[in-house]
Amino acid sequence: MKRIAFVLIFLVVFAFVAGDAVWRGTSNTIIRLLKGDTGEPADQMLPQDSLPAPVARFFAHTLPADRKPVRAAELTQEGEFLLNGSWTAMTAQQYITTGRPSFIWDARIRLAPLLNVYVRDTYITGHGSMRGRVAGIYPVVDAHNNAALDTGALMRYLGEAVWLP
């Protein structure tokens, strides 16, 4: 009986470790592809006299004329996520590009001690996707090839573009 319990515990731990490794590998592959294909950012900004006054002032303070355009940014986030009506701890990494508007957001949301939901949102080549798996193994969401999701992912990209002045 002890042997069966040991084997079951080993299999569960192995599945969790393998799920994490496969999930991270996929996310890292997407990031490598985005890093290699950032496209060409705009050479120059719009003339400041064509912008509304508050926007022109913002750009004057944040974007000196000799500054090169931002091509990509990597963000790390820690916080809480509203899941099933209660807030729970989460960590995330996000990689965003500007030449070809794209992002990947890879999060771990705590379900219970030692048990996370892995979530990956992407916006690449005009298409959004959302994938989530418990412990990186059991799928709980897999959404893609959806015009509403594409639109939502683009809106998120534009909303987060302030990180890339």
What kind of region is each of these model predictions?
Residues M1-F16:
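N-terminal Sec-pathway targeting helices
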Residues F14-Q93:
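N-terminal cleavable signal peptides for secretion/export
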Residues N28, N84, N116, N145-N146:
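Detector for Asparagine
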Residues P47-P54, E80-N84, W105-I109, A153-L164:
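Short linear motifs at secondary-structure transitions and domain/linker junctions
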Residues R57-G136:
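N-terminal mature ectodomain segment of secretory-pathway/periplasmic proteins
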Residues R131-P165:
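Flexible, processing/modification-adjacent segments and terminal tails
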